[in-house]
């Protein structure tokens, strides 16, 4: 996006303003005679799916990492570790099929929805995809906590769970942050799985239970059909730049929160 100037050509066109692009509520690039290039529905969908995915994945990932590092015996840990690492290598389209067959019908029944494809379905699928990364990195960070620190805490009368909460987790916060950032990176940039389960409706969602569309899904679905050099093509390149800055913003936010906890 930096090497190619396509991402900025759209804004140089006098017929399309910065406000129309970033505050526009309609994405209809093939409309005639006036195509609509509003990014707001796509930005909103990306943020909703990504943030809900992390809210789902983080507590589960941290709980499993704590269990593997501090509670599980050697045999169980050796059984769980390769299984979790194997999950991280499964193609995203397989997760998408799983979401389409299992999660989408389940949400449709539980919430009595007209269609099960929704932002929540995408968030759950992305959370499942991010879990192996979060668990693996967090568990490795916790196991690096010095044994002497654990023994000193227990010698002072702290229980095992107090030691985990007051000693192990604070010591491992940098590793936990790395796992979360890597998980967020996969969630924000994921394409195929989200494309299959979110409904792909380019409208601003009023609920996480409504269909929506994310930026990566839009780029993947439309780039092949957009005429090279046209306004639609340039808008998709600009969407890629926006996605890059959204990823940076979320990562900086996570890093700032974890830095505050370290202090």
Which residues are covered by each model-predicted region?
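Cytoplasmic-entry segments and transmembrane alpha-helices of multi-pass inner-membrane transporters
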Residues: 60-99, 137
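Hydrophobic positions within alpha-helical transmembrane segments of bacterial inner-membrane proteins
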Residues: 46, 50, 54-62, 66, ...
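Periplasmic/extracellular loop-to-transmembrane helix junction in inner-membrane transport proteins
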Residues: 2-53, 73-74, 221-233
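Transmembrane alpha-helices
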Residues: 137-138, 154, 160-198
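Interhelical loop and adjacent transmembrane-helix boundary motif
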Residues: 109, 194-244
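C-terminal transmembrane helix and the adjacent membrane-cytosol boundary/short C-terminal tail
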Residues: 139, 143, 147, 154, ...
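Generic hydrophobic transmembrane alpha-helix motif, especially the helices
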Residues: 85-123, 127
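Residue-level signal for discrete positions within transmembrane alpha-helices
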Residues: 42, 46, 82-85, 89, ...
């Amino acid at each position: 996006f930096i090497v190619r100037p396509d991402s900025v050509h759209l804004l140089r066109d006098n017929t399309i303003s910065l406000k129309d692009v970033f505050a526009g509520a309609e994405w209809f690039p093939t409309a005639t005679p006036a195509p609509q290039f509003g990014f707001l529905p796509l930005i909103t969908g990306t943020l909703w799916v990504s943030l809900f995915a992390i809210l789902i994945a983080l507590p589960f990932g941290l709980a499993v990492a704590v269990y593997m590092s501090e509670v599980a015996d050697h045999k169980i840990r050796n059984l769980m570790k390769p299984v979790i690492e194997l999950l991280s290598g499964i193609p995203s389209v397989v997760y998408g099929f799983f979401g389409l067959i299992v999660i989408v019908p389940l949400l449709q029944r539980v919430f009595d929805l007209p269609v099960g494809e929704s932002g929540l379905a995408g968030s759950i699928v992305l959370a499942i995809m991010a879990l192996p990364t979060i668990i693996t990195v967090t568990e490795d960070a916790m196991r690096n906590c010095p044994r002497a620190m654990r023994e000193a805490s227990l010698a002072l009368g702290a229980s095992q769970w107090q030691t985990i909460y007051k000693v192990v987790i604070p010591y491992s916060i940098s590793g936990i942050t790395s796992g979360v950032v890597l998980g967020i990176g996969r969630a924000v940039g994921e394409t195929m799985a989200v494309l299959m389960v979110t409904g792909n409706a380019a409208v601003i969602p009023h609920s996480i239970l409504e269909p929506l569309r994310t930026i990566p899904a839009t780029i993947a679905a439309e780039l092949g059909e957009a005429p090279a050099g046209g306004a639609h093509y340039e808008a998709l390149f600009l969407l890629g730049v926006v996605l890059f800055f959204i990823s940076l913003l979320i990562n900086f936010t996570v890093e700032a929160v974890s830095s505050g906890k370290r202090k």
